[in-house]
Structures are given as C-alpha cells and as structure tokens.
Amino acid sequence: MKVSYFHVAGEVPDTINGPDGPDAAVVIDVLRATTTIAWALHNGAEAVQTFADLDELRAEANSWPDEQRLLVGERGGCKLDGFDLGNSPMSVVPDTVKGKRLFMSTTNGTRSLHRVREVACVLTVALPNREAVAQRLINDQPEQVWMVGSGWEGTYSLEDSLAAGALADSLLAAGATVANDEMQAALALWSQWKDNPEACLRIASHGQRLIRLGDHDADFQRCAGLDQLSVVPTQAEQGVLRAVSG
C-alpha cells in the first residue's frame, strides 16, 4: 500500500480517475466536517449526503419528507440561515439525527468530497475514527491511497495534515509506504503533536478562527479525541456516506 497526501482538493492530480489514480481516497476535514460526519453516523444517522452547491442541496432535500431530513450547513464557521444544524460534532446527538438523512454543505470539506467522488472507494477520517479507518484500509489493502485535506478556502490547514499523519502512522506500522513529500511532512507533524493534538488544533489558523467566533471548547475536545469511534464513513453512492464498522 502506497499512501499520498494532498493538502486541498485543488492539489489533487487530474489523473485521479485514470489508471494512475488511487484505489481509495480518504477525505479529511478535522475542523469540523469529517468529525461531524463520523459522530452523526455513529449516533444513528441514516446517511450523510454532501453537497458543494447549496441550491443542489436544497433541491435534493426538498424531495425528502421533513421528518426524515436535516439540513446541515456552515460557511465561515457559522450555521447557515434556514438550516437545522451547523457544522458542530456536538450537535449531532442521537435524539436529533437517529434515522435521518443529513444534507450537508460546509466551507471546505464538502468540496474535497466532491473532488474524489468518482474513486472506487471513498472514506472520510477524523481523529476520533483514525484507527477504524486504518483497520479498514489494512484489511482491504488498496494499492494506492490518496488522502485529501480540506484546508481553508483552498489553502493549507495544519489540523488536516495532523490527521493525515495520524492515519499514515497506523498504516506504516502495518507495512504501508509513503509516496510523496506532503505525506512525509504530515507524519513529522503528527510525531510532534501526537501527545497533545488538541493544542495543535487550537493554534491552527482555523482553530483561532473558531475561538474568535465564540466558545468552541467542546468542539475542540471532540475533534481532538483520538480513536473513540469504530465507524468508517463510506461512500455508498456519489455524495452519500453511510456507516461501516471498522
């Protein structure tokens, strides 16, 4: 297994859907989309359907009964007007999400999911389900794994690279090899911060952005909680993620 990391969707090579592309793609958005997705599916959501475009989200959501859907939307770290939930993993509790489909669009994470949507195997990872995703990949043994960060509006993010390094650390222990320099750098970042990932999330520029927006202590704790979940969000059809146990 060869593992590569690309900081944002815009850095993903155009060969993604060709013979030199990945057998599996893993999307990362630690603050906060892939953390929220993992917790929503863990807490019983029927599925999370992701959209880069808000008009497409609303059109698809309107085809579902009100009692079976939730609109989850965020731009700039804030909940969108008219949506049921923002992008906080603390909001997707069982009483709210169980049995429902979440129609989700965020500033960054849903763009990366859209970029890799045609890959045969698409997963999402965050720190809470790091080991579950690692075990899924170790069991399946795809030849090429591309991790794709979400960044912030097309630019590098510290926290996504941290999670990429965390996942790669588990994969390398099982015999995987590093395929690009971005992956090597992410591993070095994880080595530096693995004993206190929450501190890394807080000093990251997006962490600082959330701090300026208000009290997000609970979000930071949840996003930094390592290996707490066994759920592996897996694309069942383009844009639709469902829970699979790791």
UniProtKB/Swiss-Prot annotation:
Tagged with keyword Hydrolase: yes
A GO molecular function held by the record: magnesium ion binding
SUPFAM superfamilies named among the record's database cross-references: ComB-like
UniProt entry tagged with the keyword ATP-binding: no
Keywords, ordered alphabetically: Hydrolase, Magnesium
Pfam families assigned to the protein according to its UniProt record, in alphabetical order: 2-ph_phosp (PF04029)
Family indicated by similarity: Belongs to the ComB family.
Protein name in UniProt: Probable 2-phosphosulfolactate phosphatase
Domain of life, per lineage: Bacteria
Transmembrane feature ranges: none
InterPro entries: ComB-like, ComB-like_sf
Enzyme Commission number: 3.1.3.71
Cofactor or coenzyme needed: Mg(2+)
Primary enzyme class: hydrolase
Reaction(s) catalysed by this chain's protein: (2R)-O-phospho-3-sulfolactate + H2O = (2R)-3-sulfolactate + phosphate
